[in-house]
């Protein structure tokens, strides 16, 4: 505020406001506070740089609308003709090991488990995961990397999991592994099996699986300690098995009421 007041005093004459020649920083602060302007703070925003942002967003919302429509038509025991998946990778998950052992809670002394501040990094892994939007099942795989080869391995797993006559629709971003030459070559070996619906650039928030990743970060990964990368992979496998015993169906609501579809699943 001091520098702003000084700038105003130095230039008020040429701007036609000579009365401001004695302006002090306290007055500047009061004026800015009254109109709720805080020039000393910076808020960040993300500019839309994808010229097809709205179109791609609508394509993604159409998928979510199709899911809701299909849910209202099929019965519990019916096999849906299409599998709708939300897919993404979560790279850089650290395997962290304690250097000193955790200390148990002690009544009257320590109400919680005590953990030493120092730890050892054992390396990182990548999570490749798809959520079935119709039944909530999570298809999760832990890999050392997340290149085209790992993505193709995930596609092969999905191809083996779903019946041959089921179309697999996947919402995903345009990561290089998803559009690579290797990936395209694999897709040619399973024609009409997969359909990719890409989120717009800087539109990862449109992908439901990001909600699942956020949940993992807040819960499962928040305080986990392991003795090896292999143990971390095993813990992930146990975690996926547990959540798939009682899967949660994620639902999208934002702007979904603006999407209108005619049923293509009915017999009429």
Model-identified regions with their sequence ranges:
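Acidic, metal-coordinating catalytic cores used for nucleic-acid/nucleotide bond scission
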Residues: 146-147, 170-181, 201-206
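C-terminal domain-tail junction helix/linker
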Residues: 231-268
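RNase H-like polynucleotidyl transferase catalytic core
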Residues: 109, 114-119, 188-208, 224-226
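Charge-mixed, compositionally biased segments that are often intrinsically disordered regulatory tracts
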Residues: 2-7, 11-121
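Active-site proximal helix-loop segment of RNase H-like, two-metal nucleases, encompassing DDE(D)
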Residues: 209-231, 244
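Short, solvent-exposed loop/turn segments at secondary-structure junctions
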Residues: 35-38, 89-93, 133-135, 175-177, ...
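Electropositive, glycine- and tryptophan-enriched low-complexity nucleic-acid-binding patches
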Residues: 106-166
């Amino acid at each position: 505020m001091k520098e702003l007041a000084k700038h105003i005093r130095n230039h008020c004459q040429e701007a036609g406001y000579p009365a401001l020649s004695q302006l002090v920083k306290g007055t500047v602060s009061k004026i800015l506070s009254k109109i709720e302007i805080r020039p000393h703070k910076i808020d960040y925003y993300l500019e839309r740089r994808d010229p097809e942002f709205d179109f791609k967003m609508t394509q993604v919302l159409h998928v979510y609308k199709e899911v809701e429509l299909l849910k209202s038509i099929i019965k519990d025991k019916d096999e849906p003709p299409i599998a709708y998946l939300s897919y993404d990778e979560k790279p850089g998950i650290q395997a962290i090991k304690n250097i000193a052992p955790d200390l148990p809670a002690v009544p009257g002394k320590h109400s919680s488990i005590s953990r030493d501040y120092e730890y050892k990094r054992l390396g990182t892994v990548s999570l490749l995961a798809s959520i079935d939007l119709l039944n909530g099942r999570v298809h999760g795989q832990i890999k050392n990397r997340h290149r085209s080869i790992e993505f193709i391995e995930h596609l092969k797993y999905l191809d083996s999991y779903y019946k041959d006559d089921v179309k697999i629709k996947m919402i995903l971003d345009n990561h290089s592994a998803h559009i690579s030459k290797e990936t395209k070559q694999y897709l040619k070996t399973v024609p009409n099996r997969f359909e990719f619906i890409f989120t717009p650039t800087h539109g990862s928030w449109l992908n439901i699986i990001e909600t699942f990743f956020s949940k993992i970060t807040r819960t499962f990964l928040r305080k986990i300690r392991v003795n090896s990368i292999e143990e971390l992979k095993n813990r992930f496998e146990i975690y996926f098995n547990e959540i798939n015993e009682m899967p949660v169906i994620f639902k999208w609501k934002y702007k979904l009421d603006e999407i209108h579809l005619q049923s293509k699943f009915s017999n009429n």
